Amino acid sequence: MSMRDNLDISAYLVLGPETTLGRPVGDIVAQALAAGFTIIQVRSKVCGARELMACAEEAARAIAAAGAQDRVPLLIDDRLDVALAARDADVKVDGVHVGQSDVPVETCRRYLGEDAIVGLSARAHEMRDYIATADMSLVDYLGVGPLHETATKPDCGMDDDGRVITRSLEELADLRRISPKPIVVGGGVKAADIPALAKTGVDGFFVVSAVCAAEDPRAAAAELVDAWRANAYVTGDGPAVTFG
């Protein structure tokens, strides 16, 4: 059984060397795993390929040291080439996360294989079109946001006019109802957001600074995980929910 068959995106950490306040990536990963995070993505818009590979290797070592290599996937953001190179160097990279303007998911799947995890993010209206028209068997989960504006990724949710469009709880609930794949939501998510976010029926949250920039990353990660576990319900048809 591959990780695709038992994928848990409920507590999703995104990090890179520029997000950890100078602390080792592996240390932040280890603390997040100890708190119960379930999936790790290495992302950097400033690292070259070799540096990103080294970062992935550090994260993979932390996952292995926690004994979680068979249940916590490690993904690379955007860079299919880095994921392939890391695998060639015997680094356990389990897949990639791409946007609709990045390498096509069909290409990612072809090169990484059937057991790899491929995640996709897009603007909400584009996600609707994708769900309606694309071969969803190629994708394992969908990333949606931002819930709030965020300095970590200021262009997240930006429309063609340069405005950042955040996602309402109603919109997230509607997307989850129509999606055949799990949905993870991020963009400035804090522990206080988790109860309402879980009520939408989405399958998880993703964070960067809430853990990576925290004075105590493990405590911050645990607060998020505990809030999710206390509020999430098994998705499916789910209850009818209202917000406000």
What spans do the regions from the language model cover?
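Short amphipathic secondary-structure patches
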Residues: 109-110
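Short, flexible/disordered intra-domain loops and linkers
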Residues: 154-166
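Acidic/glycine-enriched connector segments
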Residues: 103-104
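A short acidic, helix-capping loop that chelates divalent metal ions and anchors anionic groups
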Residues: 42, 48, 148-157
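Non-cysteine beta-strand/loop elements that form the S-adenosyl-L-methionine
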Residues: 99, 139-149
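Conserved N-terminal beta1-alpha1 strand-loop-helix module at the mouth
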Residues: 1-97, 114-125, 130-140, 163-183, ...
